[in-house]
Amino acid sequence: MKVIFLFILFSLLAGCSSENNKAPSVLSDFIKADYSHNQSIISCELLPDRNLSSVERLIPVFVEKLNKVRKKDDEVMFFFPIQFENSSISKFKILLNHENKVLLEEMHQTLSELSFEETALCNTEETSYGRLSLFESKFESTLAVVEMMECKYVNDFNYATMKLVFEEFIDALAKLDQKVSIVYSENLEIKSNFRWFNIFDSIESRKIFIESWQDLSVSNQMQTLFTEQSSCGASTLYKSYKVI
């Protein structure tokens, strides 16, 4: 699944200017990501005698409580892995895009009040991430297909050395005329770690997007340039339900 990420980024690196050749540490001093939100992920695993219906019944309660404290643009999404085999889903994630810690604290309090530990065991990441939307399409539904990848900059490269790449990326996506959203999320404590999100309205639209991107002549030849700056693990596909 990591192919889509590589095809996207490889093609963009062709547009990098000489500024990317400056020392990465120097660039990072004055080129920083302008995050729109903090991003936190709560990872959960269902207890053996529970199923996703047990979780879905509690979502309206989450929505009611979180709506009382959230900022206007705060978001909460439930991520359920997409499995192509006939197997039950036992793990899921709750992703929060929040302006401050109030939303996250209210989520923890709500989980406790609902005795959610009787349904699933959950752990919140110790570090938050900064969220930056690189490209955004408007989706009519609150349901989406999300492809997430864990990545790491190598050899002291960082966001500053990739900024021009992302700008070229936005231009390339606009020319493709495909409905996709792209989100970059950077670890606020370990800046070399980041996440990449590709967001589609369906599995079929993801397939069409990949085919369209592969048709771009510059995509394949940029693989070496991208791997010089970062490395990524295998991506994971999720069905995303935006509840707030």
PLM regions with names:
Residues 16-220, 228-244:
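Short S/T/G/P-rich N-terminal loop/turn motif that feeds into the first structured element of a domain
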